Every structure is written in C-alpha cells, then in structure tokens.
C-alpha cells in the first residue's frame, strides 16, 4: 500500500496531524470542516477567500500554515469547483488533487475531511471507500527496478479519513490493495514479469490466506488437456507458459464467479512483428491477467462471502524458428480448429483455451478481461473499457458497477451479423475479422468458446495503462470488478 489509513472523528481544529484537508467551492462556500476551521481561526479562511489568496476553482490547492486556533500546523484547501455541479467526478478529482499536493514534502500525516461532503446519489460509505482507493492510487510510486536512483522518501504516509464506518474503510483498503497489486505486476518489465514469475507471485499471495488456494499448470499439463491454441502462441518463447488458477472459497456451496484474464507478459506480435511506436509498451499486454489477480486480492482481503475462481493463461508471444505462423491451423481445447490469419491476434488464442478450461467450474457468471484490441482504443479512447455480452442482465450488472465507482465501461454490439467475418475455408474459425470492427470481431471470436455460459468480455486496451513512455499501469478495471462482486455478495 502507498498509504496507511485510519478513521478519525476528532474535531478538525483539534486533530493531531500534520495537515487538515478541507474544501472550498468556486462561490467561496466552505466545506463543513473548513467552516469549523474558519470559526476556530476567527474568520481567517473567509478573509483569504475574499481577497483571492485561496481559490475554490477545480484543480486548485492552497497550503496554509499556522492558522490561529487550529492544532495542525498546516491546512490544505482544495478547490471543489461549481457547487451546483458537484458530484462523483469532482469529488474523486478533489481527493486525487489533495493527495498529489501532499505526496512529497514535509507532511507525513493528514486528516481528509472531504468525505463529509454530500455527493449526489452516493452515501457516506461510498465516500470513504472511494477516498481510500483514489488517494492510494494518487500516492503510488513505482520503485521495484530503480536500482541506485534516489527515491524521495518524504511525503504523506498516513491518511486519516473523517468518518466512522469501519467496514467501508476495510473494503476501500482491500480494493486499493488489489489495484496496487495489479499496477505493480503491470509496471514490471518483461524480463522480470515472465509467465513463471506471474504464476509464482499469484500463488505466493494465495498461500498466505485461509480459504484461498492456487494451482499452477505447466506445459505438460496443458498439453494433456489439449490446449493447442494457447501452446501454439507459446512456442516461440524460451519463457514457458503457465496456467494460473486461483480460488477463493468464501461462499459455501454456491456456484463461483469466474474471471479469466489475458496474461501475455510480452507481445512481440510474433511473425507479424509489431513496429516501433507500440512494441515498447507491450509489457502491458498482461494487464488483463494482472487485473483479475488484483480483483482476487481485493476479494480475499475484503473476505467477500462468495466463491471466486480466477484463471490466467500466462504466455509470452515471441519469435524463434519454432514460432507459429500465419496460415497455421491449430486445434483448441474445445476441439474447434482455428486458422491463424495474424500471429499478433494472439490474445484470443490463449483466452479461448482458458475459457474452455473455466467451464469445469460451472460458473454463475464468466467474465474475461483483456487488452485485446487496438480497435477498441480507437473507438473508445482511454476513458472507458469496451464491454460485449449476449446476456443483458450480466452486461447491465457490470455497467452499473463501473458507473458506481467511476471505472466505467461502454457496451459494444455482439450481433450475429459480425460472425461471418470470421469464416475460414481451412478451419472452423479464422482468428481475425478484417479491417473493420476489430474489437467486435474479437469478441465474436471469444463468444464461439462460451456458447453455454453466462459470459461477458471486457476489452481494456484503452484503460489498462497511461499513454506514453512515462505512463504506468492503472489497475483498471479492478474497481469495476470488485464492485460487481460486492454487489453479488450483498
């Protein structure tokens, strides 16, 4: 965790912390805690707002020192924007802005009072949970491979949250831990995070908690199961594949929810080699796997009363003389044959075998998560994941969960009219569907291996990582998936 969290019900003026975080709206209205500090300081905040030294506009942060009548040596005033438009997005932005303002510097402990604000259509528990997940996300620092590079160890370490809901805090912390677990895996370079490393890390976590268990299948076991599609992708790499299976037994005899995550630890594109301008970010092609493992972490930490199974096919798509080729015909675990039109459409080839494997758990619902297509990113950008399902009830559950925590998805069609684009003369199905509608035809391909399941597909290509060389893994959509499971456990 980037931060440690506690609950605090002290009066803001007397709280024993390095900094109190309060809010101000653009019309100079103060948040309740800010009003209390204004009263304790005999109108100091009101005076500063009146003369323009403190602003309430969105994105502004002003650090004040030594307010009279206030025990904390610092007060951070965060701009909340237009009071009439204040809602989910401005609330989450304000939390992130506050955390980033205190991330480095002399403030080690702070009291966040923004949780007392009224957020339309949300309750106090939501305020606390989201404050934890957003602030921890903003405070995250990647250090695993920095070597001798100096890391600034100063800055915020402990955040007290105004409120008294211990369960909301615990769920928020569990979700934040899951997000950070996923981000750390996603950010590791591919010479560190190999299929074996990914499997070992997931198994090590599961081994620490009663009710959690892990099974790691090696190449020989996958061969015995007939996973010819997955193993074809793995053929060109010295880093041999693993199938990661994690189980959380929190729901008695109930049928499990099953999450399948694409775990391509590096994607060269294979014989259809990727070009500069994209290949250097292909360590993030395992973020679907990282996300479902992170959701498993959140579920276990929150001790949700459900059964959950996570399946991650962990594979590197590399090139040598044994690598699979365009025009190869391979046989999947389902028995369906697949003509390879492009070796860079490998994610669906490992997922189809993992989805077939997942059927043995008799899922209540089956959801796969994958950085599957650039086409989804072209269609939807970096703001939302793409969602495909033939099951309206499941799709609506996932959409509602994402909307609730602002980790959103947008539904794309999965109509039968697209299926003909996958026809092959030489096999049961072609692994690409042509130039147009690439995200949808990828979903159609997967649908052929989930015909007997209540299934949905999340294409997270646009949301799994930030854009550019300074970007990092985001941990999305751990928030969406964890909320969906929380809703199922309610």
From Swiss-Prot:
Cytoplasm in keyword set: yes
InterPro entries linked: Leucine_aapep/pepB, Macro_dom-like, Peptidase_M17_C, Peptidase_M17_leu_NH2_pept, Peptidase_M17_N
Name of this chain's protein: Probable cytosol aminopeptidase
One of the GO BP terms on file: proteolysis
Cofactor note: Binds 2 manganese ions per subunit.
Residues at which Mn(2+) 2 binds: 262, 267, 285, 346
GO cellular component entries: cytoplasm
Keyword line: Aminopeptidase, Cytoplasm, Hydrolase, Manganese, Metal-binding, Protease
Pfam families in the record: Peptidase_M17, Peptidase_M17_N
Subcellular location: Cytoplasm
Binding site residues for Mn(2+) 1: 267, 344, 346
Principal location: cytoplasm
Highest taxon in the source lineage: Bacteria
Function: Presumably involved in the processing and regular turnover of intracellular proteins. Catalyzes the removal of unsubstituted N-terminal amino acids from various peptides.
GO terms assigned for molecular function: manganese ion binding; metalloaminopeptidase activity
Residues forming the catalytic site: 274, 348
Protein EC: 3.4.11.1, 3.4.11.10
Cofactors that this protein relies on: Mn(2+)
Keyword Transmembrane helix among UniProt keywords: no
Family: Belongs to the peptidase M17 family.
Catalytic reaction equation(s): Release of an N-terminal amino acid, Xaa-|-Yaa-, in which Xaa is preferably Leu, but may be other amino acids including Pro although not Arg or Lys, and Yaa may be Pro. Amino acid amides and methyl esters are also readily hydrolyzed, but rates on arylamides are exceedingly low; Release of an N-terminal amino acid, preferentially leucine, but not glutamic or aspartic acids
Gene3D superfamilies: Leucine Aminopeptidase, subunit E, domain 1, Zn peptidases
């Amino acid at each position: 965790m980037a931060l440690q969290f506690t609950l605090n019900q002290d009066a803001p003026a007397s709280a024993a912390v390095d900094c109190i975080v309060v809010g101000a709206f653009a019309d100079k209205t103060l948040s309740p805690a800010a009003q209390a500090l204004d009263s304790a300081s005999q109108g100091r905040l009101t005076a500063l707002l009146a003369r323009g030294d403190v602003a309430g506009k969105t994105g502004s942060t002003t650090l004040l020192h030594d307010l009279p009548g206030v025990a904390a040596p610092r007060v951070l005033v965060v701009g909340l924007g237009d009071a009439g438009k204040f809602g989910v997005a401005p609330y989450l932005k304000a939390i992130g802005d506050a955390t980033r303002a205190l991330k480095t510097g002399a403030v080690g402990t702070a009291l966040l009072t923004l949780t007392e604000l009224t957020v339309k259509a949300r309750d106090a528990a939501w305020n606390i949970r989201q404050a934890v997940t957003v602030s921890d996300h903003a405070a995250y620092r990647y250090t695993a491979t920095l070597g001798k590079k100096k890391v600034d160890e100063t800055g915020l370490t402990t955040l007290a949250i105004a409120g008294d809901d211990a369960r909301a805090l615990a769920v928020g912390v569990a979700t934040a831990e899951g997000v950070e677990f996923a981000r750390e895996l996603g950010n590791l370079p591919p010479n560190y995070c190999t299929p074996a490393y990914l499997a070992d890390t997931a198994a090590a976590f599961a081994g620490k908690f009663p009710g959690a268990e892990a099974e790691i299948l090696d190449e020989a076991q996958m061969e015995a199961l007939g996973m010819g599609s997955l193993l074809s992708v793995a053929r060109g790499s010295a880093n041999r594949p693993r199938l990661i299976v994690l189980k959380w037994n929190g729901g008695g005899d109930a049928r499990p929810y099953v999450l399948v995550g694409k775990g391509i630890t590096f994607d060269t594109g294979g014989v259809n080699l990727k070009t500069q301008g994209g290949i250097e970010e292909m360590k993030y092609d395992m973020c679907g796997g990282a996300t479902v493992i992170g959701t498993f972490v959140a579920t276990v930490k929150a001790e949700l009363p459900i059964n959950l199974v996570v399946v991650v096919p962990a594979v590197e798509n590399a090139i040598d003389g044994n690598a699979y080729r365009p025009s190869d015909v391979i046989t999947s675990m389902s028995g369906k044959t697949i003509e390879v039109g492009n070796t860079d459409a490998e994610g669906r080839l490992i997922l189809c075998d993992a989805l077939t494997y997942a059927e043995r758990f008799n899922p209540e619902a089956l959801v796969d998560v994958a950085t599957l297509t650039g086409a989804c990113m072209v269609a939807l950008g970096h703001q939302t994941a793409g969602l495909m399902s033939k099951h309206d009830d499941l799709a609506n559950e996932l959409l509602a969960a994402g909307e609730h925590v602002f980790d959103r998805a947008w539904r794309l069609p999965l109509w039968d009219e697209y299926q003909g684009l996958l026809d092959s003369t030489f096999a049961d199905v072609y692994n690409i569907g042509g130039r147009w509608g690439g995200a949808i035809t990828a979903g159609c391909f997967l649908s052929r291996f989930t015909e007997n399941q209540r299934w949905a597909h999340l294409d997270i290509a646009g949301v799994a990582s930030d854009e550019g060389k300074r970007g990092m893994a985001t941990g999305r959509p751990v928030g969406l998936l964890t909320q969906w499971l929380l809703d199922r456990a309610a």
